[in-house]
Design a protein with these regions (language model features):
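Conserved active-site motif detector
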Residues: 1-112
Length: 112
């Protein structure tokens, strides 16, 4: 499967870039009841809670990464990402765990 990347933004409303370190694993959780964005996915850390959101606007999604709406159908309700790059306004992460299983032919090929 081709690697998938997402952009985390909005962290300046929480703890800034301080919680983010290259290689750090972050839990992402779909938030369909979010009043501002039905496709919202929050980024969380166990000890401190919400640290940002997966970008879902063409103005905030880094080139080459998926938006919250673009990744939502490919991942489970909770999934894990790994921090790859950090800038002052964006954190680029690779999705490392929590993909939905493919059904049909691809699943049959995996069993062989």
């Amino acid at each position: 499967m081709k690697e998938k990347y997402i952009t985390i933004v909005g962290f300046n409303h929480y703890y800034g870039v301080a919680p983010f370190k290259i290689g750090k694993k972050i839990k992402c959780v779909k938030e369909p009841s979010n009043p501002y964005d039905g496709e919202a996915i929050k980024a969380t850390m166990k000890q401190i809670g919400t640290i940002g959101y997966v970008a879902n606007s063409p103005y905030t999604v880094a080139k080459g990464t998926k938006s919250a709406g673009g990744i939502a159908h490919k991942v489970k309700k909770k999934f894990t990402v790994e921090v790859m790059f950090i800038t002052s306004s964006k954190v680029i992460c690779k999705v490392v765990d929590g993909f939905k299983e493919k059904k049909g032919l691809e699943l049959l090929e995996k069993e062989d």
